[in-house]
Regions:
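Flexible phosphate-sensing "switch/lid" loops adjacent to ATP/NTP-binding sites
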Residues: 1-252
């Protein structure tokens, strides 16, 4: 019934008078729900290293909520001691929606966050052109860490402990990595290098071990950013000002 009601409330278009047209007005919610009956079951697949994984839903956060289905996450929690799920498109967009929407509606309480960083992205944030990103530039890394700092601050608003994971590439240098590590240490955040891109699971072992220890400490005090009883406009303003640094929001 919950799924059917949500489908019924989907806006599919607008009338000439700019009134929203919902699926319920087309009497199509029953048929759509029936079509989703089989698709609603998570797909159990295996990684290249024969580890189990659920692939179920994957909308990007710039167009939707940016995370997989509640069914997949809850199924995984029943089958494993630790569950890793991706909330893509940055801590300002993907993580915010994961926390405020998915976790709220599904009753989930995350134990830890891995904030993924790359030297290329940080150098780009530091003002380096795309064609020059393969060249070592420690100063650009330091300048780009201002962006990383904001993501760390955003996650802190939800009360979940965070670790920065450096997604290592073969063009990275030790000095660039050290600049990121030093920055994180100065802000009281652990930082681990992960070479899974090149070395698979073995390359992520140190990061995984650290996160498991962090989870076992049970230090998370997760809370959502806003209350359900706030108006849609107030919720939007609160997200814009607290996560994105906006002064206010305007709509016509």
């Amino acid at each position: 019934d919950d799924l059917k009601n949500r489908i019924a409330n989907i806006v599919v278009g607008y009338t000439k008078n700019q009134e929203p047209v919902k699926v319920s007005q087309l009497n199509a919610e029953g048929a759509i729900t029936a079509l989703l009956r089989d698709a609603f079951q998570p797909n159990l697949v295996q990684t290249l290293e024969n580890n189990p994984a659920f692939m179920h839903g994957g909308p990007f956060a710039n167009i939707a909520h940016g995370c997989n289905s509640v069914m997949a996450t809850k199924s995984a929690l029943k089958m494993a001691d630790y569950v890793v799920t991706e909330a893509g498109f940055g801590a300002d967009l993907g993580a915010e929606k994961f926390f405020n929407i998915k976790c709220r509606k599904a009753g989930l309480s995350p134990d830890a966050v891995v904030l993924v960083a790359t030297t290329k992205a940080l150098k780009m944030h530091g003002g380096i052109k795309k064609e020059d990103l393969k060249e070592e530039n420690v100063q650009a890394i330091k300048d780009g860490c201002k962006n990383l700092e904001r993501h760390i601050q955003n996650i802190a608003k939800f009360g979940v402990p965070v670790t920065v994971g450096i997604n290592e590439y073969f063009t990275d240098t030790k000095d660039e990595h050290q600049a990121i590590i030093d920055f994180c240490e100065a802000h009281g955040v652990a930082c681990k290098i992960s070479s899974h891109w090149e070395n698979g699971g073995e390359g992520a072992a140190d990061l995984a071990s650290h996160v498991a220890d962090l989870v076992d400490k049970n230090e998370s005090s997760f809370e959502t950013l806003y209350d359900d009883d706030m108006s849609l406009w107030d919720k939007t303003r609160h997200i814009a000002t607290s996560i994105y640094g906006a002064e206010d929001i305007v709509a016509e």
